[in-house]
From Swiss-Prot:
Belongs to the phenylalanyl-tRNA synthetase beta subunit family. Type 1 subfamily. Binds 2 magnesium ions per tetramer. One of its GO terms (cellular component) is phenylalanine-tRNA ligase complex. This is Phenylalanine--tRNA ligase beta subunit. Residues 39-150 form the tRNA-binding domain. It comes from Protochlamydia amoebophila (strain UWE25). NCBIfam families: pheT_bact (TIGR00472), YtpR (NF045760). Residues 402-478 form the B5 domain. CDD domains: PheRS_beta_core, tRNA_bind_bactPheRS. It is found in: Cytoplasm. Residues 705-798 form the FDX-ACB domain. One of its GO terms (molecular function) is phenylalanine-tRNA ligase activity.
Length: 799
């Protein structure tokens, strides 16, 4: 938002340097991005009166103009297409100075294509007044030739960024009000002096609010016999300094009042409004409407429109229509000032992809009790710059009352929160400076009436924030109030999540955070995630189709992470995410906390002596087994449940004490192809509540062995359909304390073996921690285990 200092000074007396004003506003919560001084990029530039124009004899695109400075006539060669007889424009005579790319240069006599030129006719951009460069400046015909241009355009412009809660500051008056509160300088409001005459407005126009929920107040005036044309210089200068383009005197007045008082207005051509009736209604589904920017919009029945007796003439709070636009032919106008619900305006603006200065202000909230004063201010200015007859009275339909909110604010609470010792009088002064009426209860509380333009103040803590702003954050003592933290212990699941997080970070994994919302595109990529279609939870009012479904797994979001990074040439992607998944179980909506682990890329950094190896199933399995060991889970079981998400032979589901905790594996190649990803993706997902339930955290620390152990190998043939985990489980069920460990040494598959069989070699390590183990004892124990396992798999195992 651009705020000209000269305009600001019309409402508050400020004898401060721009840097001081910027600091005051910043400390009050308005973010001043900076300020610039305009009109100082030139000197000696004056108003020139173009007396004659003829074509250049030696150049098709050049003109020869005779320009008066009020005393003498100068011949100037100009290339602007809008140079014409009778135009008042910016004239830099010989000796004037301009600045180009930071360097000053003086205007000198010269020749262009053989014709002498004594000066330069300037655009606003060349004078660094604005960025408009569509021709030389067109000044008011009422200006005297020879008038110094810097008296009209020199100014300081503040660039202010407003947060959404500061809608009441989105105007010149709003910023002046903040400065008044911070400096105690009195605020002057705009004058309202005009004359009503002519017919009673009820004889010229009727008003009907059908959509009462979306529009709770609508006011309008009729002004007849206006003369639409160019705006006077003072009006045009203020509009352009504030970053808007001058259109005509009627439109410029509505923009002027928007900038000045912060409330959007709109003017309709009265003679183009059918039935002389204004109807505030919802659009019809599929209704087509051409907005002022020349684009046709397809409306929905959730869009609020202003209509006449036949058709829409404006999208309420967003933009007017071509079919009622004020033009040079307009002689009678309807001037609108209304209060539209911020939610309706925001939805309409987003759905149509159409954001305007008006919609931004309506979305932040405007003051419904300001409508009449805003309307009258605009009517007064229109009468001043365009003439016309303001018809008697105002059409004003209101569907509800807008009362000031009364909030109890305790003095003790103010000092407790801020760590201050403010007196009652100091707080009263602050409330008065803010324009808040109040009553003191004689003990500790103020009953504060909040003006309706302060939509951001809703409860006591908001009033305390206002006190802090005006008192000054830099005046609040650093040793503020002391507070005791909650004595309630953290939730066990939260502590468990933190433990998992710390371990996985220590493993060298990055933490990812993805969105809970996904779209059909990702769902189609992943297809079946062990979750039926009826379990998917859809969002009723999604902001976009790609955020219309709550995720049933962390995989879709993490696949997006892989795709994005590979597209940006980042091939090493190892990380995890702790988040929530959502699904529907019958009529109940369920939410679960899960951890997802993802590996993609190479297991070791590049080395010239070693061949690069991609992450595989066993890399992921190793991380998971280490995590389980960290959690004290000693006997995990892995089963292949043939989940469609994973490669059929490179997956496993994790069971602990018959409880399925999660699954992991290599993401199915078909998913990789749909993502257009060439490198392997490993993924695992585990239910945190289930993991916490089976975690014991009772780590058994074994001392280093002081007695030697003994090893035995066993090679046997077994069906490939028997999971290795089942064999290990059978051994552990029969083992004694002498068996320290069992390792898989080798798996051999060959056409020479019986179809569907493989050779497997296991190494058994025996040790007695109290003495040297006898070989006879080892042999007996080894034979016992071999016999037990052989009997267990009698139909599947051959020795």
């Amino acid at each position: 938002m651009r705020i000209p200092l000269s305009w600001l000074k019309e409402y508050i007396d400020l004898n401060l340097e721009p840097v001081e004003i910027a600091k005051i506003l910043t400390m009050a919560g308005l973010e001043v991005d900076g300020y610039e001084e305009i009109g100082k990029g030139f000197s000696g530039v004056i108003v020139g009166d173009v007396l004659e124009v003829e074509k250049h004899p030696n150049a098709d695109k050049l003109l020869i103009a005779l320009v008066s400075d009020g005393k003498e006539i100068h011949q100037v060669v100009c290339g602007a297409s809008n140079c014409r007889k009778g135009l008042k424009t910016a004239f830099a005579p010989v000796g004037a100075s301009l600045i180009d790319e930071g360097k000053e240069f003086k205007i000198k006599k010269g020749k262009l294509r053989g014709i002498e030129s004594n000066g330069m006719l300037c655009s606003a951009k060349e004078l660094q007044i604005s960025n408009e460069d569509d021709g030389i400046m067109e000044l008011s015909e009422h200006l005297q030739a020879g008038t110094a241009l810097n008296t009209l355009y020199s100014d300081t412009i503040f660039e202010i960024s407003l947060t959404p809660n500061l809608g009441h500051c989105a105007s010149i008056v709003g910023v002046a009000r903040e400065l008044s509160a911070a400096t105690s300088h009195p605020l002057r409001y705009p004058h309202l002096v005009f004359k009503e005459e002519g017919n009673l407005i009820n004889n010229s126009l009727t008003l009907d609010i059908e959509a009462k929920e979306a529009c709770s107040r609508y006011t309008c005036r009729v002004i007849k016999n206006v003369k639409v044309g160019a705006s006077p210089d003072w009006l045009k200068a203020k509009i352009e300094k504030s970053g808007l383009r001058s259109v005509n005197n009627i439109v410029d007045v509505t923009n002027y009042v928007l900038l000045e008082m912060g409330h959007p207005l709109h003017a309709f051509d009265y003679d183009l409004v059918k039935g002389k009736k204004i109807v505030v209604r919802m659009a019809q589904e599929g209704e087509i409407f051409e907005t002022l920017d020349g684009k046709e919009r397809i409306l929905k029945d959730s869009h609020l429109v202003i209509a006449d007796s036949e058709k829409p003439i404006a999208i309420a709070g967003v933009m007017g229509g071509r079919n009622s636009e004020v033009s040079e032919k307009t002689t009678n106008i309807i001037l609108e000032s209304a209060f539209f619900d911020p939610i309706f305006v925001r939805k309409t603006s987003k759905q149509l992809g159409l954001q305007t200065d008006a919609s931004k202000r309506f979305e932040r909230g405007t003051d419904p009790n300001q409508l009449i004063s805003v309307l009258n201010r605009a009517a007064m200015l229109i009468q001043m710059v365009a003439g016309g007859i303001i018809e008697d009275s105002i059409l004003d339909e209101q569907t509800k009352d807008f009362l000031e909110l009364t909030i109890r604010c305790r003095l003790s609470r103010i000092n407790q929160i801020l760590g201050t010792t403010l007196s009652r009088g100091e707080v009263e002064t602050i409330f008065q400076s803010l324009g808040f009426h109040y009553q003191w209860d004689g003990q500790d509380s103020f009953m504060v009436c909040v003006p309706t333009y302060r939509t951001d103040v809703k409860e006591e803590i908001d009033l305390i924030e206002e006190v802090a702003r005006i008192y000054g954050y830099d005046h609040i003592p650093r040793n503020g109030g002391r507070y005791q933290t909650s004595k309630l212990p953290d939730a066990p699941i939260y502590l468990f999540e933190k433990e998992i997080q710390s371990y996985l970070i220590a493993e060298g994994l990055q933490e990812f955070i993805t969105c809970d919302l996904i779209g059909p595109t990702l769902v189609n990529v992943v297809q079946n995630l062990s979750m039926p279609a009826e379990a998917i939870v859809k969002v009723l009012n999604p902001t976009s189709i790609e955020q219309s479904i709550l995720r049933t797994s962390l995989l879709p979001g993490l696949l997006q992470v892989v795709k994005y990074n590979l597209d940006h040439q980042n091939h090493q992607i190892n990380g995890f995410e702790i988040g929530r998944i959502h699904f529907k179980d019958g009529d109940q909506y369920q939410e679960q906390s899960v951890v997802g682990i993802l590996l993609s890329g190479f297991s070791q950094p590049y080395h010239f002596e070693e061949k690069k190896r991609e992450y595989d199933f066993y890399d992921l399995k190793g991380i998971i087994e280490n995590l389980l060991k960290e959690l004290g889970i000693e006997k995990p079981q892995f089963k292949n449940l043939d989940l469609k998400t994973f490669h059929s032979g490179r997956q496993a589901s994790l069971f602990v004490d018959e409880l399925e905790v999660g699954s992991f594996g290599e993401v199915h190649p078909s998913i990789q192809r749909r993502l257009d990803v060439s490198q392997r993706i490993l993924f695992g997902e585990f239910n945190l509540h289930d993991l916490m339930q089976v975690a014991t955290k009772l780590e058994k620390v074994k001392p280093l062995a002081i007695y030697p152990g003994s090893e035995r190998d066993w090679t046997f043939t077994i069906k490939t359909s028997v999971p290795f985990a089942e064999i290990i489980k059978a051994i552990h069920e029969q083992k004694s304390d002498l068996l320290e460990n069992v390792l898989l040494l080798d798996i051999y598959r060959s056409e020479k073996l019986t179809v569907g069989h493989q050779n497997m070699t296991l190494r058994f390590i025996y040790r007695d921690f109290s003495k040297t183990i006898a070989q006879e004892v080892v042999e007996n124990e080894h034979q016992r285990l071999k016999t037990a396992v052989s009997q267990k798999f009698a139909n599947d195992l051959k020795q």
